[in-house]
Amino acid sequence: MASPADSCIQFTRHASDVLLNLNRLRSRDILTDVVIIVNREQFRAHKTVLMACSGLFYSIFTDQLKCNLNVINLDPEINPEGFCILLDFMYTSRLNLRENNIMAVMATALYLQMEHVVDTCRRFVKSSEAEMVSAVKTPREEFLAGRMLNHPEVMAYRGRDVSENSMPLQNGSLCNGRAFAPGLFNSLPGSSISYPGYSPLPLNGFLVDDELREMRMPLSELSRVSAFPKERIPCDGSRTIPAEYMRTITDISANMCHATIYSPKEGAAEEARSDMHYSVASGPKPVVPSIRNNPYFSCDKVAKEEERTSSEDEISQHFEPTNTPLDRKGLISPQSPQKSDCQPNSPTESSSSKNARISQNSNSLFTKSPTDPKACNWKKYKFIVLNSLNQSTKQDSADQNEMGTLSPRTYMPMSTCQQSMEPEHLNVQSPTKMSVNGEDSNIPQASRLNNIVNRSRDGSPRSSEGQSPLYMHSSKCSSCGCQSPQHTEMCLHTSGSAFGEEMGETQSEYSDSSCENGAFFCNECDCRFSEEASLKRHSLQVHSDKPYKCDRCQASFRYKGNLASHKTVHTGEKPYRCNICGAQFNRPANLKTHTRIHSGEKPYKCETCGARFVQVAHLRAHVLIHTGEKPYPCEICGTRFRHLQTLKSHLRIHTGEKPYHCEKCNLHFRHKSQLRLHLRQKHGAITNTKVQYRISANEVPPELPKAC
């Protein structure tokens, strides 16, 4: 093991604690260095946080002429509520989305160039308005480069266009073009410096007229020309551009961030100084998606009800993309925050987990039922996801039992070799405890062997449709003649037997048998075996559910490996170590669960609210919140609890047990949280890595403590 000087310790909660402390500094107006004005409302923040979360603020504060600004006026028609929600998201990583503010938040996120928030808003719209998804299916690149995202001052050019200094702008196809924004940011009143910069967004959504008949047309008029481009042009140059194409531009903001209104006179003067063909907005327009003009956000419920059933498939096929979306990485300018390490990626909850990425990129969100048994993990989701299927399955099984038949799915043969064929035995449950809903909650190894026998019998010619499923009881082992269906798979003479060496070692209490003429008989079911090892395997699998017992706590296990893993609890051995933080565990499964803390993976999802969890046990506990079930009652006072651990903690009130001990002052506590609070208050100990500021709003500390 490495020495403490060579080890690297990672605090998993450090990032969230720093963000929490920054939010508290903002709420107390400590070290805030910029004021954002949105529609006469002021928001104080830190420049570092703003530029780390927003591409717009990154482009502003990285410029040497603009980095010292202390007051920034955004577009007056930007919704202050949407900006407030995004500002809180920057400091808390929690996005408060509701149906009444989703459009404002999305428009503001587009304005601030927070693409991961835009993607989240789009998924929120798809989940809440399922009919919108079937109306228009737009690829991500086309949506981001479409009508709502482009800068107000758009220059449409071709390869032969030349700027003022006779330098060619760009040679290539139109799909590789970029928008040029001469007025991306205007400084405060008193500063007349114009800041030219390239937009990081491609213009693959614009199709320019080859004769440039509309180059001088105002953007407000161009937005009424057409709702969609007539045809998309592939970037490979294999197709020729027709003579006439219409371009679609919506009413967008005249300035990305400004203190003074950009007037048409200034635009005319700017146009007169340049030979390039670009259009100037006639006035300030908000970066708000137009509900009427944008069919993606069309919310006319009357029209949707009339057209939803008839033309749903036609619309989805009509707007299907004809070519592969462009790679926008090659079009990003040097000033784009996406080429900097400070540009934020998507939140960990939505990008790190492979399950989350699959759900985000998949278009079959509503085509597959969340309760599809094939999509569920039977061992982990059987109690949570299949609750709705249990009732219907039980009802079907009850109907079959009334007819005197056994379902092939629910059938399980008895463990004895000689089973009576009387009708009363047909409905007797076997020791395997196979439930009628298909759940294998308490199935021993013998039951799994029976399933193998069932599958092999179904494929044999002797198993016909009219044959009773109890046929296998009359089958005999070809090697030793035993009639037990379990023995057929366990006998060493049978070909294809795949039992490990550890299954041959059993305790003496399961080997009670009688030996006669070299043959071994089982005293439980009178099965005959040629070797003693076969008899031991038979006793282990058929007549014992959990033969391996711990000699310290009497815990029993089905497999020897589980017993060996259990003994590490008593010995304190933790051979499995995390390579990132050095934490050690006694089981590999615990190490696997721990590594999800570092990777951010949350594979278990609640089908009701969409919350994700690291462990399936956390998901099971969370599901009880929706069902309202409290299955754990206190036998003394009758109080019911949702979780078993809460009940165990409650029982200490009645028993008086105080298992948590303070080594410094010899005090005992009933709960672990009480001991932690005592250590913090009385002994000044830091019980975890979460450091919080304990100062009043009016008090400004001379030096901030360091977060661990």
Swiss-Prot record:
Give GO terms for biological process: actin cytoskeleton organization; B cell differentiation; cell morphogenesis; DNA damage response; erythrocyte development; germinal center formation; inflammatory response; negative regulation of apoptotic process
Protein origin, superkingdom: Eukaryota
Subcellular location(s) per record: Nucleus
- Which chain segments does UniProt annotate as zinc-finger regions (C2H2-type)? 520-543, 548-570, 576-598, 604-626, 632-654, 660-683
Domain BTB, residue spans: 32-99
Q: Which UniProt keywords apply?
A: Activator, DNA-binding, Immunity, Inflammatory response, Metal-binding, Nucleus, Repeat, Repressor, Transcription, Transcription regulation, Zinc, Zinc-finger
The UniProt record lists the keyword Transcription: yes
Where does the record place Basic and acidic residues bias? 303-317
**Keyword check for Repressor:** yes
Q: Name one Pfam family in it.
A: BTB
Under the heading CDD domains, the entry gives: BTB_POZ_ZBTB27_BCL6
Provide ranges: composition bias, Polar residues: 333-370, 431-454
Q: Which Gene3D superfamilies match?
A: Classic Zinc Finger, Potassium Channel Kv1.1, Chain A
- The segments labelled Disordered in the record are 303-371, 431-470
> Which PANTHER family does this UniProt record tie to the protein?
B-CELL LYMPHOMA 6 PROTEIN ISOFORM X1, ZINC FINGER PROTEIN
Q: What does this protein do?
A: Transcriptional repressor mainly required for germinal center (GC) formation and antibody affinity maturation which has different mechanisms of action specific to the lineage and biological functions. Forms complexes with different corepressors and histone deacetylases to repress the transcriptional expression of different subsets of target genes. Represses its target genes by binding directly to the DNA sequence 5'-TTCCTAGAA-3' (BCL6-binding site) or indirectly by repressing the transcriptional activity of transcription factors.
Please report the name of this protein according to its UniProt entry: B-cell lymphoma 6 protein homolog
